[in-house]
Structure formats: C-alpha cells, structure tokens
Design a protein with these regions (language model features):
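Short, acidic Gly/Pro/Ser/Thr-rich loop/turn segments
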Residues: 158-159, 219, 279-282, 313-314, ...
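PLP-dependent amino-acid enzyme catalytic core
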Residues: 1-5
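Conserved C-terminal alpha-helix-loop-beta "cap" of PLP-dependent enzymes
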Residues: 223, 231, 237-238, 242-332, ...
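PLP-dependent enzyme catalytic core of the Aspartate aminotransferase-like
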Residues: 30, 41, 48-49, 57-58, ...
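Short, well-structured beta-strand/strand-turn elements
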Residues: 7-11, 244-247
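Conserved PLP-enzyme active-site core in the AAT-like
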Residues: 8-239
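Flexible loop/turn segments at secondary-structure boundaries
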Residues: 120, 141, 254-256, 281, ...
C-alpha cells in the first residue's frame, strides 16, 4: 500500500485471485465490466468465461481505443473498468488518465493491473486510477520463489454515489456493518478483506508472504537493472536485420513511447516483445538455441527467460482474440533479467545466428 500510495492492501494467493476479488468486491450477477482486450490470457478468460458464467457481462475494448469508443462501451449496469498499465505480452501502454476519466464520468472505479511496471516505475493512483492489482509472483518477488497477488485501494473513490449499496447499506453477514461509514476511505479494501477473503479463502501462505517481503527489499535496485538491460537489448534487436519487428516502449520508434514517457518516465519494465524474420518456425529455433536464457512460462524474473505466448499463455484464445490482444503468431516475449548485459546479448546473438541460417 505504501509503495502504491494507497490506504490499504490485501495480499492474495495469486495474481488471478487478486483480479477476481478486485472485481467481485463491487460486481455481482447482473453487472457489467469494461475491460481492455490486451490483457494476460488468464485474465481475458476470467472475464470472457468465468465471470460470464457467474452472470457478469464484459465488453472488451482495444487499449488503443479513442475516448468516444471507450465511452460507448459503458452500460447502465457497468460496475468498473479494468486494464493493464503495460499489457502482457503486447506491451501496449494504456492511457491511464483516459480510462480513469471515462470510468469516473460513468460513476464507476478504474481498476488497473500494475504488475509489469511495478510502483517503482508507475504509480497509477497519481493518474486517477482507483484500485491497483498485482501478481506479486512477478517483479515484486523477483526470484520466482513464491506465488501471490495483491489488491491496493487508493481510498479516493466515492462509494456514496448511489451505485454501490454494498458499501452504504448494512452487511447482514457481518453484524450489519456499513463499510463506507465504519471504514471511510478504506471501505473498499476492508470489504474485500472482511467479506471476500472470508468466503473465498484465497489468502497468501505465510512462507509466500515472507519471500515476498524479502524480494521487495531489492525491488528498486532490480527494476533499475531490468530496465537498463532491456533498453540495451531492445536497441540491439531494433538494428539487427534478422529481426522483423521490436516492441519496447523505451524505444523512440515505439508507438507507445510518448505515453511511456508520460506514465513511466524512469523506465517501463524488463519485458520486450519481438518477431524474427521467418515467423513462428524461426521463433521456435531461436528459443531452442538459447543457452543462458530459459524457455519458461514465467516472466519478470531476475533471470532472463523467453516464451512464445500464442502457444502457451494465450493458447486457449481464438485467432481473432489473439489478434485483439496483440499476440501475433511470431511474437516472442523476452523477459530480460539482471545478468551482465553483454552475456545476455551474446546469447541472443548466437541464437539468432542459428535460427536464421
């Protein structure tokens, strides 16, 4: 909570648990959510399938949508807006102020997953966002030794606007407590703890909480190295003729560079997405040829790792859904670690050589 500048936080058993509880805390059967289409594959299916089966509808919008297109997605029963600060794995920088302003114009909160930038590089509350979620399994831990998530409440949203009776009317399951009256600015996070955590039980294991605290002690140092290493790798890839395209918001050539400088002026994250000439087959050869980097589904680790999202993290999505999420068949997600940058570059160079022979 202190890192994000919020009034309170709740640590959960996973990032997915945090996302689900963040939404269910204010949304129930008959409700509606507006969600960016460029989100983690598990998050997409949470909104597309699981919440739908619970009676909660979702309208997906492009993270590149205009203000008018975003506003058109709202309904009378919309309860919140959800997006990722920096999308996984397409690395689109979401216009936080536009999403937050649209949410507030319709009387609902804006929820943002801030996993990739971390509060070291971006503090969404400063741009109008109301609730932040994290998969603490990623950079906050940084060592891939624990599984967890977190919800952080800014304390800025007015729950007394008439749209959220669950905060202004007595909760009969908790001695008639009225969250907005009893907890004030911390009403949202208090309800998540007293109501949802009680009923769902997705709390963090004690050892995972210990490892998370340990990892966060070096968060600022690690993020600085992740970002500087990733910038060097991205600049190399951009100049290599064997590479078809590179997307990293830190590059001036990125269509999201301007937004990145607005919301993350000191760095974005250590993740790069790119494609090799030769498409999916070349991508497979490249990953198989890496020696230092590991081919794993994990991301945001202090060790360099690589992944093909279309066949792993996003494999359950249709071709059309993959396109909407910005996941092309040739996309390689490179999570740059904190090793010596020359060692990482040498590994990439030799793998490119083998992949494009």
């Amino acid at each position: 909570a202190a890192l994000e500048g919020g009034v309170g936080a709740l640590v959960t058993s996973s990032g997915q648990a945090a996302t689900m509880m963040a939404v269910l805390n204010i949304c129930h059967a008959g409700g509606h959510v507006v969600c960016s289409s460029a989100v983690y594959g598990g998050t997409f299916n949470l909104f597309y399938k699981t919440l739908h089966e619970m009676g909660i509808d979702c309208t997906f919008v492009s993270p590149n949508c205009t203000e008018d297109e975003l506003n058109a997605a709202f309904r009378e029963n919309t309860r919140c807006v959800f997006a990722e600060t920096l999308t996984n794995p397409s690395l689109v920088v979401t216009d936080l102020e536009m999403f937050a302003n649209a949410a507030h114009a319709h009387g609902v909160p804006c929820i943002v997953d801030n996993t990739f930038p971390t509060p070291i590089n971006c503090r969404p509350f400063e741009f109008g966002v109301d609730i932040v979620t994290h998969s603490t399994t990623k950079y906050l831990d940084g060592h891939a030794v624990q599984l967890g998530g977190a919800i952080v409440d800014s304390g800025n949203f007015d729950w007394n606007n008439g749209k959220f009776p669950e905060f202004t009317e007595p909760d009969e399951s908790y001695h008639g407590i009225v969250y907005a009256e009893h907890f004030g600015k911390a009403a949202y996070i208090a309800k998540a703890r007293c109501h949802l955590m009680r009923d769902i039980g997705a709390q963090a294991a004690p050892m995972n909480a210990f490892y998370l605290n340990l990892g966060m002690e070096t968060l600022a140092l690690r993020m600085e190295r992740h970002c500087s290493n990733a910038q060097k790798i991205a600049e190399f890839l951009e100049q290599d003729d064997r590479v078809a395209w590179v997307n990293y918001p830190g590059l001036e050539s990125s269509p999201y560079h301007e937004l990145a400088m607005k919301y993350m002026p000191h760095g974005t994250c250590g993740v790069i997405s790119f494609g090799i000439k030769g498409g999916r087959e070349a991508a497979t050869r490249f990953m198989d040829s890496l020696e230092l980097a590991s081919v794993v589904t994990h991301v945001a680790d202090l060790r360099t790792c690589v992944l093909h999202p279309a066949s792993t993290t996003h494999r359950q999505m249709t071709d059309e859904q993959l396109k909407e999420a910005g996941v092309s068949p040739d996309l390689i997600r490179l999570s740059v670690g904190i090793e010596n940058p020359e060692d990482i570059l040498d590994d990439i160079k030799q793998a490119l050589e083998k992949a494009t022979k």
